[in-house]
Amino acid sequence: MELWFTEKQTKHFGITARINRTLHTEQTEFQKLDMVETEEFGNMLILDGMVMTTEKDEFVYHEMVAHVPLFTHPNPENVLVVGGGDGGVIREVLKHPSVKKATLVEIDGKVIEYSKQYLPSIAGALDNERVEVKVGDGFLHIAESENEYDVIMVDSTEPVGPAVNLFTKGFYAGISKALKEDGIFVAQTDNPWFTPELITTVFKDVKEIFPITRLYTANIPTYPSGLWTFTIGSKKHDPLEVSEERFHEIETKYYTKELHNAAFALPKFVGDLIK
């Protein structure tokens, strides 16, 4: 008998993957966690029925969350990742030698635990000496921080359950306070096909707080619609005005210095969402 997993991305549309076996399933304090081995995409982390990451395509999301802001900032030393318990963004952050400390604040410790066990190629960097892992509420951590970070990355689930507070104007204002005077922040902001209103709302809220606010995209096969957006807010440095000499060689599979600028070239229907 064949076993298949289906994520209903809307009431009328979804994606399906053939499952070889279930590695772990658990109702944590915060969400339903499933780790499965798929035929096509390797091991897959699923939270509340939504695909969070897979071994095959994870690099796209993690590279684009990390490298766009880190190459935009001239000297990122202290970095905060809110969410991201799978460790993929942290792995990419550590590719930048200027980073002296990377802090991860993940609300669900079980995500960290089982990512280390079943997604070692993604989560392996969490044990690096430059990394501090905190199991706790990222919203509260931001509220308690001031003038501390060069770059803040919000690697959250969609705005449901424990992540709902991470999509509020108050949270973005807190991020601005937690950043240094030339700090940069980035957040994943879902897809333009199924959640256009979210993109419009987040962009508007961020733009009212950060003088430089831009939207960029990446193609991620297992995420709803495949076209994903990210909103970047910066106090001083424009991601479209990065000097050539700032780019240094790092090992990537998706991000390149050419793609850095190209990612900000939006399809018209996406650009219309933020006018």
UniProtKB/Swiss-Prot annotation:
Reaction(s) the record says it catalyses: S-adenosyl 3-(methylsulfanyl)propylamine + putrescine = S-methyl-5'-thioadenosine + spermidine + H(+)
Any one GO molecular-function label of the UniProt entry: spermidine synthase activity
Keyword Transferase applies: yes
Catalytic residues as annotated in Swiss-Prot or TrEMBL: 155
One GO cellular component term: cytosol
Tree of life domain: Bacteria
Role this protein plays: Catalyzes the irreversible transfer of a propylamine group from the amino donor S-adenosylmethioninamine (decarboxy-AdoMet) to putrescine (1,4-diaminobutane) to yield spermidine.
Protein name: Polyamine aminopropyltransferase 1
Organism (species): Bacillus anthracis
